[in-house]
UniProtKB/Swiss-Prot annotation:
Protein name: Cysteine protease ATG4A
UniProt region (Disordered), positions on chain: 1-32, 439-474
Biased composition range(s): Polar residues: 439-449
Alphabetical keyword list: Autophagy, Cytoplasm, Hydrolase, Protease, Protein transport, Thiol protease, Transport, Ubl conjugation pathway
Oligomer and partners: Interacts with ATG8.
A GO BP annotation: mitophagy
EC top class, as a word: hydrolase
Any one GO molecular-function label of the UniProt entry: cysteine-type endopeptidase activity
């Protein structure tokens, strides 16, 4: 994806760090100049709300100035400190960005240094947000891996962004499941076996459970192929097929040969491309968990993928507040979406801007062995936060949620139902207890249906893989 331009910056600004200037002009060599320079630098760092977003400089702002020697030495010293490591990401030209709350995968962060909330749902501090962001698994274009299937493709550059975005979302689900939402990437080795094992699953070879190779193979019937771009609905179905295949063949995924949670793909119609509000059916989710637990009545963790079509050529503005609110759910796994033709992994929101991890960076393929706790993992993490106007998101997208247990799922359903009440007749998705038997379509191995909830689900489908069965409501 192309870089976003800088916003709200005057090229005539005199601040040496925020504008990228080396130092002020040498027209005055007095000590007052040095004092003003120090105050300006410190003001840039401390007085305004930190900017945690990637700053893009206008070339016109980089003027060639001849500094006073003392001032220049001081500015270089502070610049070296401030622009080394992650600290530089709090500086930059994006002063137009507000100090509003950031919601990131169900957590709220206060970016303002003033009026800190007493709410237990909010965490204060830019550093805390950046640590959370940089701990998320970042999966990008890779090159130099073994050819995909019978093709000659050894790289997914320019076509694999939807696959990579979906891998990021599922990777977060596995992190939340095995390590918890509060997990942060350790600063020292050896790493935990769970963390390394998750990264191994997303390696770029057929030996890795959730590799691009295996996803394309699983999604063949939905149009997935090396060299071709794919939409979010087909991507969700490819995951459904791959998880089912892994379970049937007892491939090593979580140590027991299974994906460690049930998977429920919910969509609004048969092909997922004509729109219609998806229906999350509680009885279907319960059946999926039962099948996952080999017909035991206990509830299992469950991953919900909800592909949506929220407009024709552009996102219908009425859905924007609803999309933003899904990112406040504790169960949130983010959104597969981005500008048309350029998928990203949207994991947060501030005001009218989506915050995302970008898969469009090309990196060499790496092989992380499942038992190598000293492996280098830096290529799977990114501390550059990118943002995108919400109204520029492609209307075809998918939302993910992870529910750890029955109470967590009930909480999700409660929040989703409240969201329906705010939708003014156009919800993202709805929640029902059961579905009408006459509206269900089963495959040849399917069993009979459940009772009908009061809501009319004609023309909608809620499908999820139930062991060897697939549920569809048409």
């Amino acid at each position: 994806m192309t870089s976003l331009p800088g916003r709200g910056v005057s090229p005539s600004s005199s601040d040496p760090l925020c504008e990228g200037n080396a130092a002020p002009s040498s027209s005055s060599s007095s000590g007052q100049d040095l004092k003003q320079l120090k105050n300006s630098i410190l003001s840039c760092v401390f007085s305004s709300p930190f900017s945690i977003f990637e700053a893009h400089q206008d070339s016109s702002a980089n003027r060639s100035l001849k500094p006073h020697s003392g001032s220049y030495a001081w500015s270089r010293f502070l610049r070296r400190i401030a622009c080394t490591g992650s600290m530089w990401r709090f500086l930059g030209a994006s002063k137009a960005l507000t100090s509003s709350d950031v919601w990131f995968l169900g957590k709220c962060y206060k970016l303002s240094s003033e009026e800190l909330s007493n709410s237990s749902d909010c965490e204060s501090g830019n550093a805390a947000f950046l640590e959370d962001f940089s701990s998320r698994i970042w999966i990008t274009y890779r090159k130099g891996f073994d050819a995909i299937s019978d093709s000659k493709y050894t790289s997914d550059v320019n076509w694999g962004c939807m696959v990579r975005s979906s891998q990021m979302l599922v990777a977060q689900a596995l992190i939340f499941h095995h390590l918890g939402r509060s997990w942060r990437k350790p600063s020292q080795k050896p790493y935990s076996p769970e963390y390394i094992g998750i990264l191994h699953m997303f390696g770029d070879s057929e030996a890795c459970a959730f590799s691009i190779h295996n996803l394309l193979q699983a999604g063949k019937s939905y149009g997935l192929a090396a060299g071709s771009w794919v939409g979010p609905y087909a991507m969700c179905r490819a995951w459904q097929t791959l998880v089912c295949t892994n379970r049937e063949h007892h491939e090593a995924v979580d140590g027991n040969g299974n994906f460690p949670m049930a998977l429920y793909v919910v969509s609004g119609d048969e092909d997922g491309e004509r729109g219609g509000a998806p229906v999350v059916c509680i009885d279907v989710a319960a059946q999926l968990c039962c099948d996952f637990n080999k017909n035991q009545s206990t509830w299992s963790p469950i991953l919900l993928l909800v592909p949506l079509v929220l407009g024709l050529d552009k996102l219908n503005p009425r859905y924007i507040p609803l999309l933003k609110e899904t990112l406040t759910f504790p169960q949130s796994l983010g959104i597969l979406g981005g500008k048309p033709g350029t998928s990203t992994y949207i994991a947060g929101v501030q005001d009218d801007r989506a915050l995302y991890l970008d898969p469009h960076e090309v990196q060499l393929a790496v092989d992380i062995a499942a038992d190598n706790l000293e492996a280098g993992t830096s290529s799977y993490h990114c501390s550059t936060v990118r943002d995108l106007a919400l109204d520029l998101i492609d209307p075809s997208l998918a939302i993910g949620f992870y529910c750890r247990d029955k109470d967590d799922f009930d909480d999700f359903c409660s929040r989703a139902s409240e969201l329906v009440d705010k939708a003014n007749g156009a919800p993202l998705f709805t929640v029902v207890q059961s579905v009408q038997p006459s509206k269900q379509m089963y495959n040849e191995e399917s069993s009979s249906g459940d009772g009908m909830d009061s809501i009319n689900v004609e023309g909608l489908d809620g499908s999820g893989e139930t062991g060897e069965e697939e549920w569809q409501i048409l």
